[in-house]
Amino acid sequence: MNDNEPDYSVNLTIEDIRLLHHSVQETIKYWPGAPARPYEEQEHLWYMRDSLYRIMLDYRFNQL
């Protein structure tokens, strides 16, 4: 990610997080690979998947 790009914040429910996590997992599963898509995209998808999973684990630990 470029350091000059702005960061954004959004408010999401845990259901939103679960849906996004599933969507990212499916995108990784069917990712066509390079050179059809840039290889950095796959690394970013892994990062997003892991970040969303950490949120879900945090929710389970603190809310259930």
List PLM regions with ranges.
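Positively charged, low-complexity terminal tracts
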Residues: 1-64
